[in-house]
């Protein structure tokens, strides 16, 4: 079977306009240099390559000729190939670079491949081509890097050095001096003298702490204690023991004060809780009474209509007499056990310049709790509250 013929005219249609119209003229090289005869006889077979390109040849012939030309090209490694592939000089390279620099299409293609200064190209996770990411993605990545740096700074990577004991004591002293006491704002005028005395005691205690701290800084070292005499050591020991006693007493006082504040907080919370529960129950009772009153009015209206339709047989009946007696007993001796309620009891209260004390809140809490439970102790508790708080003897 014969090999198919290949027509090179169709494949080289784009090259034809570049050729000269005169067939006798020799073709010009790609770079504008005139061709020369090959000096090496081993390369003389390549001169007829351009003329043979136009002819019709089979695939087998083309492959064979290509192999022959390859063998000719690589036969002599010292052969000069400048005539086959002329080397550009520096001027031509510079002109081509300037031409590419002025091309808008080339600039549009190569702008996305410019490396960013903020990117670390040694990072294995970075993309192989920077052109794949748009300007928005690059901006988002820069913002993410800045956020990571801020989070690292906030997380304590650049932590400040730890404070010494002397610095901590100084900060505590400044806090105690600068922080106002919230209790002094709500204290009555009678307790102002006690507040002044306590503030003076605190200032004296602070002075003692400062003096003791200075002594510790000056003498509390191995060398300093070693060069001190026995009397000086004894005096320093007495100072330390006295400071320990004073600080222990102050600590006990502050702990007791903390317990008092916690107890006061619990009493206030319980008072507020019981008060809200009583108010909710009073609201429910009012709604229930309105509902009963409405139902009673409807029943009375219906009974009147029925009585108007019927003629009374007797002027008095046993049922009417019984109802009259029961209503009289209720008005005389009070309501029955089912209707006895202390939920709507009114507690007298006198508003003072100072808030109620813990004892007053405890008594009010007990009264409210008895009202919520509908306990019979409400009158007794209310009497005690009036005699002890409102009208003390």
UniProtKB/Swiss-Prot annotation:
Task: Report the GO molecular function annotations.
Answer: gamma-tubulin binding; protein kinase C binding
Question: What domain of life does the native source organism fall in?
Answer: Eukaryota
**Tissue-by-tissue expression:** Brain.
Localization, per the record, is: Cytoplasm, Cytoskeleton, Microtubule organizing center, Centrosome; Cell membrane
Question: Biological process GO terms, please?
Answer: cellular response to growth factor stimulus; establishment of cell polarity; establishment of mitochondrion localization; hippocampus development; mitochondrion organization; negative regulation of autophagosome assembly; positive regulation of anterograde axonal transport of mitochondrion; positive regulation of neuron projection development
Q: Which GO terms describe its cellular component?
A: axon; cell projection; centrosome; cytoplasm; dendrite; Golgi apparatus; growth cone; microtubule
Q: How does this protein assemble?
A: Homodimer. Interacts with UBE4B and SAP30L. Interacts with SCOC and ULK1; SCOC interferes with ULK1-binding to FEZ1. Directly interacts with SCOC and UVRAG. Stabilizes the interaction between SCOC and UVRAG during amino acid starvation. Interacts with the NH2-terminal variable region (V1) of PKC zeta and weakly with that of PKC epsilon.
Q: Which Pfam families match?
A: FEZ (PF07763)
What is the name of this protein?
Answer: Fasciculation and elongation protein zeta-1
Q: Which UniProt keywords apply?
A: Cell membrane, Coiled coil, Cytoplasm, Cytoskeleton, Membrane, Microtubule, Phosphoprotein, Transport, Ubl conjugation
Region named Disordered = 1-41, 130-154
The role this protein plays is: May be involved in axonal outgrowth as component of the network of molecules that regulate cellular morphology and axon guidance machinery. May participate in the transport of mitochondria and other cargos along microtubules.
Q: Record's InterPro entries?
A: FEZ
* PTM summary: Phosphorylated by protein kinase C zeta; which enhances interaction with UBE4B and polyubiquitination.
Q: Which residues form a coiled coil?
A: 231-299
Q: Which residues carry this modification: Phosphoserine?
A: 58, 299, 317
Q: Please report which protein family the annotation says this sequence is part of.
A: Belongs to the zygin family.
């Amino acid at each position: 079977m014969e090999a198919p013929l290949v027509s090179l005219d169709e494949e080289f249609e784009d090259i034809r306009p570049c050729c000269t119209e005169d067939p006798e003229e020799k073709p010009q090289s790609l770079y504008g240099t005139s061709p020369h005869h090959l000096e090496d006889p081993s390369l003389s077979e390549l001169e007829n390559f351009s003329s043979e390109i136009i002819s019709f040849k089979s695939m087998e012939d083309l492959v064979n000729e290509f192999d022959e030309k390859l063998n000719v090209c690589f036969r002599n490694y010292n052969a000069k190939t400048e005539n086959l592939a002329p080397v550009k000089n520096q001027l031509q390279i510079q002109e081509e670079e300037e031409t590419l620099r002025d091309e808008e299409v080339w600039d549009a293609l190569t702008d996305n491949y410019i490396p960013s200064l903020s990117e670390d190209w040694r990072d294995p996770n970075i993309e192989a081509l920077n052109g794949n990411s748009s300007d928005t993605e690059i901006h988002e990545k820069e913002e993410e890097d800045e956020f990571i740096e801020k989070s690292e700074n906030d997380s304590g990577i650049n932590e400040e050095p730890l404070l010494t004991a002397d610095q901590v004591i100084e900060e505590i002293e400044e806090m105690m001096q600068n922080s106002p006491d919230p209790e002094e704002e709500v204290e009555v005028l009678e307790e102002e003298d006690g507040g002044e005395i306590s503030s003076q005691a605190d200032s004296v205690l602070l002075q003692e702490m400062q003096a003791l701290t200075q002594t510790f800084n000056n003498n509390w070292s191995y060398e300093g204690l070693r060069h001190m005499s026995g009397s000086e050591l004894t005096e320093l020991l007495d100072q330390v023991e006295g400071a320990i006693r004073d600080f222990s007493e102050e600590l006990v006082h502050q702990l007791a004060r903390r317990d008092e504040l916690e107890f006061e907080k619990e009493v206030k919370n319980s008072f507020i809780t019981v008060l809200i529960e009583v108010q909710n129950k009073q609201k429910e009772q009012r709604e229930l009474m309105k509902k009963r009153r409405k139902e009673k009015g409807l029943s009375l209206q219906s009974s009147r209509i029925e009585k108007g339709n019927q003629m009374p047989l007797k002027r008095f009946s046993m049922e009417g007499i019984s109802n009259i007696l029961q209503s009289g007993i209720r008005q005389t001796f009070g309501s029955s056990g089912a209707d006895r309620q202390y939920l709507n009891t009114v507690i007298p209260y006198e508003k003072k310049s100072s808030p109620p004390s813990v004892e007053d809140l405890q008594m009010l809490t007990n009264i409210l709790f008895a009202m919520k439970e509908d306990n019979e102790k409400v009158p007794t508790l209310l009497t005690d509250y009036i005699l002890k708080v409102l009208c003390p003897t």
